[in-house]
Amino acid sequence: MTINDSAISEQGMCEEEQVARIAWFYYHDGLTQSEISDRLGLTRLKVSRLLEKGHQSGIIRVQINSRFEGCLEYETQLRRQFSLQHVRVIPGLADADVGGRLGIGAAHMLMSLLQPQQMLAIGFGEATMNTLQRLSGFISSQQIRLVTLSGGVGSYMTGIGQLNAACSVNIIPAPLRASSADIARTLKNENCVKDVLLAAQAADVAIVGIGAVSQQDDATIIRSGYISQGEQLMIGRKGAVGDILGYFFDAKGDVVTDIKIHNELIGLPLSSLKTIPVRVGVAGGENKAEAIAAAMKGGYINALVTDQDTAAAILRS
């Protein structure tokens, strides 16, 4: 019996990956076939058949003989070390579009998490927009409601622009960063802004990107013009390693104080983000490892989608 490695399932996995994950959960984590079927969204009969197919094809022997084995090991370690609810580590491929593959992985995670008519809160950035582009059909068919976590309408259009016109999208009608703290306070007190922020905090699931100070001018927040290179250098000197939604935090996950941009942002603060039940972070690149680890330490995300090399770097840090 051979493994079909070309067909992709509704869960976004080829058959070999399904077999590898089932084997890992069954033999390594001690889950029952019923528990595995719930976790992967498969029938119990399908789990049983794939387990048998794994034995007959040679994937399952004394150890899991699959290129996905390393990813599963990283997922287990990340889940335990950072108390994550959900983890997906994407296998590394030479010359592959990592951002696109992370978007696919994050989209499939969200499809497994979201129930019809639930609300998804979205942060800005390339990773989240990649994800949103791959969710358009699901969002429409399941009537998922969207709400932005920050101002800056233009930052969301590459993802929102791909959606069906009938989709429910609640956008904060304000810039991401105001020209002063006073103007930011005034805008946040406007009902049209306040109502969207309250809706965002009440979301069922959130997805955010994670920026790293070490990215320098490659960081989305710089490329989008929200901060200058000089500001980023000053922020780094204050101990910041990364940011989510423009809020910077240190290696322990604590928000860095006395940073000018924090008072000028129009968006959900990280303390409020933490009240959303499921918070998915999607980020890749070894230069982001410290920032991703800090985001998990701070509790800003409790689910992660990343690539194999980044996962290894996080666990080394």
From Swiss-Prot:
Residues of the DNA-binding region: 33-56
Superkingdom to which the source organism belongs: Bacteria
InterPro entries: NagB/RpiA_transferase-like (IPR037171), SorC_transcr_regulators (IPR051054), Sugar-bd_dom_put (IPR007324), WH-like_DNA-bd_sf (IPR036388)
Cross-referenced Pfam families: Sugar-bind (PF04198)
Subcellular location: Cytoplasm
GO molecular function annotations of the record: carbohydrate binding; DNA binding
GO terms under cellular component: cytoplasm
Regulation of its activity: Inactivated by phosphorylated autoinducer-2 (phospho-AI-2). Phospho-AI-2 acts by binding to LsrR, which is then unable to bind to the promoter regions, allowing the transcription of the target genes.
Cysteine disulfide links: none
Keywords in alphabetical order: Cytoplasm, DNA-binding, Repressor, Transcription, Transcription regulation
Keyword DNA-binding among UniProt keywords: yes
Principal location class: cytoplasm
Record PANTHER family: TRANSCRIPTIONAL REGULATOR LSRR, TRANSCRIPTIONAL REGULATOR-RELATED
Function (record text): Transcriptional regulator that represses the expression of the lsr operon in the absence of the quorum-sensing signaling molecule autoinducer 2 (AI-2). It also represses the expression of the lsrRK operon. Acts by binding directly to the lsrA and lsrR promoter regions. In the presence of phosphorylated autoinducer-2 (phospho-AI-2), LsrR is inactivated, leading to the transcription of the genes.
Similarity comment text for this entry: Belongs to the SorC transcriptional regulatory family.
Protein known as: Transcriptional regulator LsrR
Natural source organism: Escherichia coli O139:H28 (strain E24377A / ETEC)
